[in-house]
Amino acid sequence: MTIFYLVFIAVIIIIILYVLYLRPLYSGTSVIKGNTQYKADKLMIIAHPDDELIFGSKELIENPGWKVICITNGSKKSVNKISICYLMGHRSTYRRDEFINMMNLLHCQYEIWDYEDNYFNSNWNLKQLKNQLENLLREKNYKMVLTHNLAGEYGHTQHKTISKLLYDINPPNLYTFYYDSNTINPYLVLIKKLSHVYQSQDKIIKKNYKYIEHQSKIAVKNNSK
């Protein structure tokens, strides 16, 4: 009985580890595009809806003319299926809808791609994703390409993976989000109002408020082609 119990526990642990860390994530090719009426000469590439608010809203407000690419949450297949909101029965497209509302308020072009949102792993089809990013960057010579840093800001594995892919592609004028404790974001009042768009992410935004308060960017060195 003891051996059976230990084997059972081991199997459960293996299943949990596989589901959280090892399983391949859904990697779809569908793209939702919006606000194409707005001109864009700068490109922001983020992993999840709300990343643009937490790490890049100062830039979006201060320097209009952005196209924002959100890599995840394009369809029911690419939502985070182990998130609290999903498990509590929220509609499956809630984060996508919140992102679109934010883009409308900020007058940004946007695309939402169809890669699965997950906190614990980033096991996407990386060859496919890299090709998609390369095709995106060939569309236009952007004045700035702004994305996650190699540390993933607070260590998020999907942030790290997107940053690494863009470092490998090495587009001109590549910048990453940067936490600068010596600066204070001058748009905190406006950003607080905008944050209400992300009702589902209220706790996450409050938890990571310091990244909003001290938003900055930094150029990637040796990035000329």
From Swiss-Prot:
It is found in: Membrane. GO terms for molecular function: N-acetylglucosaminylphosphatidylinositol deacetylase activity. It holds the Pfam family PIG-L. Residues 114-146 form a coiled coil. It comes from the Viruses. InterPro entries: GlcNAc_PI_deacetylase-related, LmbE-like_dom_sf. Gene3D superfamilies: LmbE-like. The chain crosses the membrane at residues 2-22. Keywords: Coiled coil, Glycoprotein, Membrane, Transmembrane, Transmembrane helix. Its main location: membrane. Glycans are attached at residues 73, 222. The keyword Coiled coil applies. One of its GO terms (cellular component) is membrane. It is a single-pass membrane protein. PANTHER family: N-ACETYLGLUCOSAMINYL-PHOSPHATIDYLINOSITOL DE-N-ACETYLASE, N-ACETYLGLUCOSAMINYL-PHOSPHATIDYLINOSITOL DE-N-ACETYLASE-RELATED. This is Uncharacterized protein L374. It comes from Acanthamoeba polyphaga mimivirus (APMV).
